[in-house]
Amino acid sequence: MAAPSELQLYPSVIHPAIQKYWDEFCELPAETLSAFSSYYPDILRAFAVSDFLALNILREPELVLSFLQSSQHQKECQLVDFRAPLAEELSGALKEDDLLRILRLFRRRMMFRIIWRDLVCLVDYQVTTREVSWLAETCIDEALSWIYRDMSQQFGEPHSTAGVKQQLVVLAMGKLGANELNVSSDIDLIFTFPERGETQGGNRSLDNQAFFTRLGQRLIQALDNTTADGFVFRVDMRLRPYGQSGALALSFAAMEAYYQEQGRDWERYAMIKARAVAGDIDAGEELLTSLKPFVYRKYIDFGAVQALRAMKEMIEREVQRKGQDGNIKVGRGGIREIEFIVQVFQLMRGGRDVRLQQRNLLSTLECLEDEGLLPVAAAAELREAYIFLRNLEHAIQGLEDKQTQEIPKDEEGRERVAVAMGFPGWGACRVQLDKYRDCVSEHFADIIAERREAPLERPDTIEWKALWAGRLAQDEAQDLLLRSGCDQAQEIYEAVTQLRQSSRVQHMQLQGKERLDEFMPNLLQSLAQSRASHETCRRLLALVEAVLRRSAYLALLNENPGALTELIRLFAESAWIARQIVTTPLLLDELLHSGSLYTPPDTTALRDELRQQMLRIPNDDLEEQMEALRYFKKAHVLRVAASDLRETLPLMKVSDYLTFIAETIIEQVVDEAWETMVKKYGEPGYEDAALNDMRFAVIGYGKLGGIEMSYGSDLDLVFLHGASGDLSTSGETSIANQVFFTRLGQRIIHLLTTKTASGDIYEVDMRLRPSGNSGLLVSSVSAFQQYQEKSAWTWEHQALVRSRAVAGCPGIRAEFEKVRKDILTQHRDPAKLRTEVMDMREKMHASLGTKPDSSGSPPYFDLKHDRGGIVDIEFMVQYAALRWANEYPQIVVWSDNIRILEALGDAGVFSQEDADKLCDIYRLLRAHGHRLALQNLPARIQTDELLEERRWVVAFWEKVFAE
């Protein structure tokens, strides 16, 4: 049967897609086709705008026909229209498989109805988002009720210590919280409960937290797991307190304490839309009322502008890195900018004006207009743009029922989206889209965005343009370079000429070549004026070569001359920084923000930033998570190095920050690995059933443990767990606890060390674990303690001096610290200790110390391994700590050499003068090491450098180890 004449109403490029579905549709039985005949125009439109609708029509034609004949597509639903039928269907669910099947079929049926009405009937987008939100709310609440009843049969019902019955509260964040859920969105949830206590009336009692954690886990699986029938909603729990490392369900008291003591600006932003959607709704709303002072400050909070600006800048960087210019949510002039405009007023003034404490964006926008906070015209333009963008978002997502805000890359996809939007073709749709995005971007810039510096005017660049273009003779070019302050004119001229004549430049595309031709004269003039060396020029030209095929970086530098100035300075001062930026040009983005470039964030800000970045990455996108971790490390280490060069950070702070960065990444990696393992195998079993946390910790040794990391430091790690006995994990695929923790450790190492296009994060050395490479990858705390007490060598106790817990379960970390203290403060035979420490030092020097050259003298001094160097000081510190900690346990409270030396001086083990002298020399040697590392040079100096300090260390060694 030929397609109806209405086919000609659609762009020709999508005719093949429509025809394909129509041909399959025509294979249905004749009587079915006859029943559909009055709906052919709508069927044709469905084929044109949505693969999801088309596939469901072909898969379940009788169901679709019933839907059309009952006129369901013509009426708006209420919440009860979702709840009543699902509750009735679930009343017959006898086992969990029934629950999962019924939920998924119900979701598919109702989502078909919603998307049909949205894309075929063109109902108001607010009707669509409200109905999707009601669908999600219904599925969550009905699934929760079924699972709660099922669990209560085994464990009884939760009660507070006062005997009051307890229910889980499910808080919806984001779009669901505001009743604005997209047709293909995931749902952001937080689980909480009123009070601690335990279950009553079951075969086995559980404390409330354990009960609600299990309940939450089963609810997530019921909604999120993909079966043969599909899924219900993808669930994201990362907005809960402490993120992925936090408990799945917290009591109200714990929730309030977290937000009052540790809540971040971005969490204020997230809580604006929070709403209780399932479980004890009344209790949930009471909790949210108690949290309002955290979200809405009593004073006018202008700091909210900077917080949202920082969030937006972070998103912009991500958009640039991922090439998401076509993303109508996070891209320029997109939905997120409108949300930020509205929410900045809410956060600033919501504490003083309760009318701004709304979840719905359009209602809040109207309030801003009424209050005169936004001009009437601006509010109208933003409202119109928002509705257009949300409709476009639905058209994009409804195409395949996928969560995406990216404009289709293919012509057919764009034309289908345009048809769904009511346009004759993509061209007209794009014109309207560009108009709205420009409008939103302008309003955002007026209200929130910082002004970018204007391109620097350079009236004297004619000569530099001629030099780059090759229009100057060599002597003229070199004279220009010399006159402008460049001493190595010939070398620079030759390097520039070689680049210009290279095949890569000759074969550049037009846009890239134009950007290069604009950039190079500015670069050359800036180089000359800064009196840059040939080496600096060589480094910068290497960067230019690296970005020839990614000329957007050249555009970035053309538009931000301040960034070019910073770039030249950094490249002149550090070969290491130059190498980092050449291999990872994305780091150029950091130069746009000189404020943050020279002020590295503290630990709290680091954790907060990384957590926000990871929240925006789908849970199942491992590759993107790994890339984000690698960029995070490189960007923040660059900030430390830049501050180091500018001398805004002293040596000890440099090491502190480098260590903070490592700890932050390790914490995130542990959380990611734990979540993956638990999802696959369930949680480890514990003899104490009340335990339900991670019971795993990472111990840092060496530079990490001693808070003394440098730019190229690797990680010396030991993994410990707190499980005992022969128990197994709780998942369907159950494995022994020891196997679980071993695989967890392997996963952590994999995430840290796997080389991607961006390299690895850190190299990891596990040889300091009990029994070294032949030992278990992860030991129990008790086994670790037994090994340290009975089997460890003296050098292993030396290593323990510079160890500390850096990530994981607080309980296991505390247990390790106790073991460390007990081992380090035990009594030792002084003579035996002295001999063993000296023997180990001799072995190290013989293996790693500098060997004489043909003249019989060492050619250089190795700062670390040679006599009078860093290792000598470290060995003296470790020896003194092991020798005297039994009498002065305060010596080993800290794990870093400086504070141990200070403690040795305070205790009188070393004289105060000697302790201070050792601290000064140790800092001096390490400062030289840092400077050399920033030049990509080994930690070596000339044999006649630092002679006095080295000789003093050697003499003090003799004094310390004198019999």
UniProtKB/Swiss-Prot annotation:
Stretches of the chain forming a coiled coil according to its record: none
Catalysis: reaction(s): [glutamine synthetase]-O(4)-(5'-adenylyl)-L-tyrosine + phosphate = [glutamine synthetase]-L-tyrosine + ADP; [glutamine synthetase]-L-tyrosine + ATP = [glutamine synthetase]-O(4)-(5'-adenylyl)-L-tyrosine + diphosphate
Stretch list, region Adenylyl removase: 1-451
A GO CC annotation given for this chain: cytosol
Cofactor(s) required, per the database record: Mg(2+)
Cross-referenced Pfam families: GlnD_UR_UTase, GlnE
EC assignment: 2.7.7.89, 2.7.7.42
One function term, GO molecular function aspect: [glutamate-ammonia-ligase] adenylyltransferase activity
Region described as Adenylyl transferase: spans on this chain: 461-963
The entry's keywords: ATP-binding, Magnesium, Multifunctional enzyme, Nucleotide-binding, Nucleotidyltransferase, Transferase
Gene3D superfamilies listed in its UniProt record: 1.20.120.1510, Beta Polymerase, domain 2 (3.30.460.10), Glutamine synthase adenylyltransferase GlnE (1.10.4050.10), Nucleotidyltransferases domain 2 (1.20.120.330)
InterPro entries named among the record's database cross-references: GlnE, GlnE_rpt_dom, NT_sf, PII_UdlTrfase/GS_AdlTrfase
BP terms from Gene Ontology: regulation of glutamine family amino acid metabolic process
NCBIfam families listed in its UniProt record: PRK11072.1
Function per UniProt: Involved in the regulation of glutamine synthetase GlnA, a key enzyme in the process to assimilate ammonia. When cellular nitrogen levels are high, the C-terminal adenylyl transferase (AT) inactivates GlnA by covalent transfer of an adenylyl group from ATP to specific tyrosine residue of GlnA, thus reducing its activity. Conversely, when nitrogen levels are low, the N-terminal adenylyl removase (AR) activates GlnA by removing the adenylyl group by phosphorolysis, increasing its activity.
Sequence similarity: Belongs to the GlnE family.
HAMAP family assigned to the protein according to its UniProt record, in alphabetical order: GlnE (MF_00802)
Protein name (record): Bifunctional glutamine synthetase adenylyltransferase/adenylyl-removing enzyme
Originating organism: Hahella chejuensis (strain KCTC 2396)
Origin organism lineage: Bacteria, Pseudomonadati, Pseudomonadota, Gammaproteobacteria, Oceanospirillales
Gene responsible for this protein: glnE
